Structures are given as C-alpha cells and as structure tokens.
UniProtKB/Swiss-Prot annotation:
This is Ketoreductase adrE. It comes from Penicillium rubens (strain ATCC 28089 / DSM 1075 / NRRL 1951 / Wisconsin 54-1255). GO terms for molecular function: oxidoreductase activity, acting on the CH-OH group of donors, NAD or NADP as acceptor. Coiled coil: none annotated. It is an enzyme of class 1 (oxidoreductase).
C-alpha cells in the first residue's frame, strides 16, 4: 500500500458504501476494512446477516448498516452521510420493473437517486471524495473488433435512438445517464468534494456470502448446472476480477493522484470456451457443464485507460497486474 499519510481519506475514517449487500459493494467493504477504514453500508431493508458476516471477521464497531429504503426521496441520504469522510455509491437505482418503463422514465429514476446522493454529500464538509460505480456500457458497448474506448468516450446509443427511432436497453441507458449527469452536476455546482468514477466490465470472482446474488458471477456459476443463459444473454466481453474492481474503487477514494477521473476496470477479452475449459478443470467430474458455443471470437480492441488502472493496482496494492481469468474463477468456484 501507499503511505497512509498521503491518502485523501485517511485510514480510521468512516466511509459510506451504498448497496452494501451487492456483489461488488461487499468486496469494496472488505477492501476498505482491510485498509483500516470504518464502513457504513446502506441497504433497502434490514440485513443482520451482513453485519454478522463482517463483525465475525473484523470485530464489532468497524461495520454498520443503515436502511435507506428509497433513493428517490430528496432527503434519502441525509442521515447516512453524517460523520463520513468519503462515499462510494455502488447502488445506482434502477426501476424495480423495467419492462413497463420508458427509457426516459427509467433514466430519470436513476439520475434522481444519484443527484440526491451528491446533494446530500455537498452539505457535509467532512466528505472529501465521492466515487460512483458506473459501467463499461457508459463508455460504449463495443459491437465488434477494432473498437477503442478512452476517458472521453461515451455511449452514443441514446442520441442515435432519438434520431432513428431505435430502442436502447434500459440498463445501458441508466448507466450512461447516471454517470453523465453526475459529472454535469459536479461541473455545475462545484462541490467541495472530488468525484471519481469506476467503469467495470464483466466482473467475476468470489461471492462473499450465500445471500449475495453474485450478479454476473451468478451467471457463470449457473454453467455448473448446465444453464447456458450467459451464452445468449452476455455478448463476448472483457473480464475483470471482482477484487481488482473493489480495489480500484478504494484507489478512487484515497489516491491523491486520481482526481476527477474515470477508471476503467477491464483486464482482458475472453471467449466462453476459455471459461468452460477452466470450469472443467475445477470440477472435472461435473457432467452438467455444457459445451462452449461452436463459433467464438474474442472482442479485440483497445481500452486505453485500462493500462492506467492496472498501473494503479500495481503501485497501490503491489499487484503484478490484473488478476487472470483462471485465478478469478478458481477463487469463485468450489473444487470437487
């Protein structure tokens, strides 16, 4: 680790992490606790099992939960930001039933929650950094080989849809506007804190607790039962390990060299054949693991800022580089 005295948010400070029961958020909490921070996590309903999980590993008084049931309320975060020195907003709100939503109403829902948090943070001079969990789709989901993403790249599907009458997936639209409007709000209102964002691609690795859904790792775990949904639902992407993603959030919170920056969490492209091969090595007697799709090619391109993120992981946490796919899956799948 870098010297603690250089951290923008010093160890021992309290950090707010929203959506504490989520896959990525739970790993962020673990990383922060490992670094010596106190953590307050938000959940929509009481979840004593989560408090028990972290107290068992870090002792009492290091982690606490606060219920924030509705991000849409203008005062939703007023209590949770009290006494904290940094905020990591992982749980960008999505409508509970996106099927009935228009793109406009869905993005308004997400943006409203983000802005409510930024407004609440702006009232607390103790808060030095706010980190927003965005997504690679905010920068533009590559359609094929030869793509290039950079720090100034934004997904253009919303603009194209408005001109040509095409539709945009609700999730993508919400992630794009959630991050874009956060930057616009900061530019307009000039709060005392700095904003950084983290844009992960397909995140894999260990699920910390059985009650945590596992998000994208849950799809991969389903392959062990013969569920081929990921082959159809998830286009061939790049992968990133969940702990690498969590560490990049911590870096965005504490590093004096990361200022008003977008950190891209994307390690390497892969094909489902790679995943199937690794799963069969981990569980060689599991006959339910399906065959990989016949025709696959990795999505080769250039994510320019990924090199910067990898360098930060090496400098801050002493890593050799991105965690390899095999190591990530071995950490997340039980051996037979």
């Amino acid at each position: 680790m870098t010297q603690a005295q250089n951290h923008i948010v010093p160890p021992g400070s309290k950090v707010l992490v929203t959506g504490a029961n989520g896959y990525i958020a739970s790993h962020i909490i673990k990383v922060l606790l490992d670094l010596g921070y106190l953590v307050q996590g938000t959940v929509r309903t009481p979840m004593p099992w989560l408090t028990e999980y972290f107290e068992k590993r870090y002792g009492s008084g290091r982690f606490e939960l606060i219920v924030v049931s509705d991000f849409q309320q203008s005062d939703a975060f007023d209590e949770s930001v009290k006494g904290v020195s940094g905020v990591i907003h992982v749980a960008q709100g999505l409508p509970s039933s996106t099927a009935a939503e228009t793109v406009e109403s869905a993005t308004a829902y997400t943006v409203n929650g983000v802005v409510n948090l930024l407004k609440a943070a702006s009232t607390k001079p103790t808060i030095k950094r706010v980190v927003l969990t965005s997504s690679i789709v905010a920068a533009g989901y590559p359609a094929g080989k030869g793509f290039k993403l950079d720090v100034d790249t934004w997904d253009k599907s919303l603009e194209q849809a408005s001109k040509g009458g095409t539709t945009v997936p609700i999730y993508r639209a919400c992630k794009v506007e959630g991050e874009r409007q956060a930057w616009k709000w900061v530019e307009k209102n000039q709060p005392h804190f700095e904003l950084n964002t983290v844009l992960p691609w397909l995140t894999l690795g260990k699920i910390l607790h059985p009650n945590i859904g596992g998000s994208t790792m849950g799809y991969v775990s389903g392959l062990l039962k013969g569920d081929t949904t990921p082959f159809k639902f998830l286009p061939l992407p790049w992968f990133v390990d969940v702990e690498d993603t969590a560490r990049l959030h911590a870096i965005a919170l504490i590093s004096p060299s990361v200022r008003s920056e977008r950190l891209f969490a994307a390690a390497t492209p892969f094909i489902w054949g790679d995943v199937i091969e690794i799963l069969k090595r981990i569980q060689p007697n599991n006959a339910r693991i399906p065959a990989a799709p016949v025709k696959e090619e990795p999505t080769i391109g250039d994510i320019v800022p990924a090199a910067r993120a990898e360098k930060l992981l090496r400098e801050t946490f002493g890593q050799r580089g991105w965690t390899p796919l095999e190591v990530s899956l071995e950490g997340g799948i039980a051996r037979e």
